[in-house]
Amino acid sequence: MILDKIFEKTKEDLKERKLKLPYDMLGRSLASNPFFPKDVIKALKRVEKEVKIIAEVKKASPSKGVIREDFDPLSIALNYEKNKATAISVLTEPHFFKGSLEYLSLIRRYTQIPLLRKDFIFDEYQILEALVYGADFVLLIAKMLSMKELKKLLEFARHLGLEALVEIHDKEDLSKAIFAGADIIGINHRNLEDFTMDMSLCEKLIPQIPNSKIIIAESGLENKEFLEHLQNLGVDAFLIGEYFMREEDEGKALKALL
């Protein structure tokens, strides 16, 4: 499965990064240049019919290959912010998504809205990295973590002042997210194991999610009417990447969905 390949490669990369910059040194770099994360819960919680979009900076994906040839992460991020994105998701996985932590750091320097580090996170070191490079919240994929691991990473993120978007794809993932104490739950219409899409997933899972949780819909979103349908089901915000990346003007495409 592709998820297993990505996970293994991420573990190799992390081992190298830890050798180059041990945990204590990474922590000291934060102490010398403190960063105070933004209130992600407040930003993402929907108010009436307001459309909230986490717009993604993504060059490639394992299922589609390179999506955006003329890829300028900062220009894209600034265009998103100018066109009223609620937050920006930054891919930092380098091999399959062609992302980088440097993109996250660069975008943080020039934007004011919350930033999501989107990667395959399974270690506290990666969460500390996210804070050092300027993220306000991190992605945690329920499918690739045990209940104990998910809970531990959630608690560590909060200890650092970060939030976590816990991504789910089925009832088992949802149970894991709820029992681990997730406040932000992302329902991914795309199955990460075979890339098939189930656009009815929100309808199936939202009735089982407590009202206190913030719900994010992910993948396959490119139609304003469908976004309104999902809002009526209880979705607070939408994470959209590939659709924007395929458009000539990603900011204009974003604005059209608001």
Swiss-Prot record:
Transmembrane segments annotated in the record for this chain: none
- Give the GO terms filed under biological process for this record: L-tryptophan biosynthetic process
Please name the CDD domains in this protein's record.
IGPS
Alphabetical UniProt keywords: Amino-acid biosynthesis, Aromatic amino acid biosynthesis, Decarboxylase, Lyase, Tryptophan biosynthesis
Keyword Lyase recorded: yes
Task: Enumerate the SUPFAM superfamilies for this protein.
Answer: Ribulose-phoshate binding barrel
Record's superkingdom?
A: Bacteria
Task: List the Pfam families.
Answer: IGPS (PF00218)
Q: Which InterPro entries match?
A: Aldolase_TIM, Indole-3-glycerol_P_synth, Indole-3-glycerol_P_synth_dom, Indole-3-GlycerolPSynthase_CS, RibuloseP-bd_barrel
The yes or no answer to whether the keyword Lyase is present is yes
- EC number from the UniProt entry: 4.1.1.48
Family as reported in the entry's similarity comment = Belongs to the TrpC family.
What name has this protein been given in UniProt? Answer: Indole-3-glycerol phosphate synthase
The scientific name of the source species is Campylobacter jejuni subsp. jejuni serotype O:23/36 (strain 81-176)
